[in-house]
């Protein structure tokens, strides 16, 4: 390993565009408890070592609780920020605010919230939540308003909306202003983008190739990010060998993806599925998504080619990157090389 990248956290300090990088925590499904606990601790430590700001923690009906996983992350790192997926149907906004304030009080650690509307109808039906897609985002806006007001006002708040009502509700312990949570939301649909703007949140896309955005760049009034995986090596052929070894073409996985499409009303899921085959020699790669191995596109190729794609996203206005689950420490090293080279291509960029 190159200790230079570890120590420096891949920074270009002469820049004035801040780029934040988040890793993703392993999932708890189909793995033993012992292996999962070790995976979480390892990935959290590696992510911090290689300069990530934080780490996304998934939530859905099949996974262990994201807040408890976040505590494991905090206990195994010194400054890595959990990006906790929050599904409004799971808990009252007061409970989320209480968790954020409690982590601030106990660990002096900032929490980020990744607001999810719930894309799989079966999960929502099991919880008796028939709320339509766009209405879930309208509910989310009220949900986040309550969280932000509770954490930003020590004297208490009253709020009455269409979905929630609180009366003279006060948050203790108070949250120091520097630990106020960052808010992310999936922003591929019109409803998601409107919610991001209303909440002051980062709109995160499961992106199309950067060329697709050159005639329709992201809304400059909203902070924007992308969720991608990266497999890069010095040698192009080696990168693709690793990519197909990790994500082999799988007919069973392809059928699982097609089935998932039928039970999802996520706009991003539909958009990626409609993109079709990746062109030869194009670093933008959808096989892992199309074969139900992961939920984001990948950038694959040699360092320079992948760095150029990353720099194109940054030039378009995407300044937050949420990377896929790293299978080992080595992959975070290679991702670090990519962002270092992207910083050289975009000299106004700083990875923070």
What are these model-derived regions, one by one?
Residues 15-25, 55-57, 81-86, 111-115, ...:
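Hydrophobic faces of well-ordered beta-strands that scaffold small-molecule active sites
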Residues 66-87, 139, 143, 222, ...:
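Alpha-helix-loop-beta-strand connector modules within alpha/beta enzyme cores
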Residues 1-79, 180-181:
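N-terminal beta1-alpha1-beta2 module of alpha/beta enzyme domains
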Residues 32-46, 99, 186-195, 302-312:
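Short, acidic/polar
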Residues 2-17, 127, 133-175, 210-312:
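An alpha-helical appendage that flanks or caps ligand/catalytic pockets
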Residues 39-58, 195-205, 312-319:
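Catalytic domains of carbohydrate-active enzymes, especially glycoside hydrolases
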Residues 19-38, 85-89, 93, 177-188, ...:
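Active-site mouth loops of central-metabolism enzymes
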């Amino acid at each position: 390993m190159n200790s230079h990248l570890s120590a420096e956290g891949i920074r270009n300090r002469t820049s004035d565009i801040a780029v934040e990088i988040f890793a993703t925590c392993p999932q708890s499904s189909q793995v033993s408890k012992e292996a999962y606990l070790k995976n979480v601790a390892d990935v959290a430590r590696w992510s911090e070592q290689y300069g990530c700001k934080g780490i996304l923690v998934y939530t859905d009906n099949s996974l262990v609780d994201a807040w408890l996983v976040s505590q494991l992350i905090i206990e195994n790192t010194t400054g890595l920020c959990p990006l906790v997926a929050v599904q409004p149907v799971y808990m009252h906004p007061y409970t989320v605010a209480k968790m954020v304030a409690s982590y601030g009080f106990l660990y002096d650690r900032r929490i980020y919230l990744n607001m999810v509307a719930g894309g799989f109808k079966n999960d929502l039906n099991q919880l008796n939540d028939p709320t339509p897609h766009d209405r879930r985002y309208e509910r989310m806006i009220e949900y986040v308003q309550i969280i932000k007001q509770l954490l930003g006002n020590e004297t208490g708040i009253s709020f009455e909306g269409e979905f929630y009502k609180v009366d003279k509700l006060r948050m203790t312990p108070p949250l120091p202003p520097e630990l106020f949570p960052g808010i992310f939301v999936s922003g591929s649909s019109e409803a998601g983008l409107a919610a991001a703007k209303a909440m002051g949140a980062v709109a995160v896309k499961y992106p199309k190739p950067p060329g697709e955005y050159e005639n329709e760049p992201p809304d400059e009034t909203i902070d924007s990010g992308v969720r991608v995986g990266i497999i890069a090596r010095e040698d192009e052929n080696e990168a693709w060998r690793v990519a197909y070894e990790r994500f082999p073409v799988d007919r069973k996985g392809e059928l699982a993806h097609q089935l998932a499409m039928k039970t999802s009303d996520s706009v991003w899921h539909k958009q990626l599925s409609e993109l079709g085959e990746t062109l030869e020699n194009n670093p933008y790669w959808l096989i892992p998504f199309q074969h139900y191995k992961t939920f984001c596109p990948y950038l694959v190729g040699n360092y320079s080619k992948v760095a150029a794609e990353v720099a194109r996203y940054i030039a378009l206005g995407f300044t937050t990157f949420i990377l896929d689950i790293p299978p080992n420490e080595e992959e975070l090293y290679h991702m670090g090389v990519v962002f270092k080279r992207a910083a050289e291509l975009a000299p106004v960029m700083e990875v923070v």
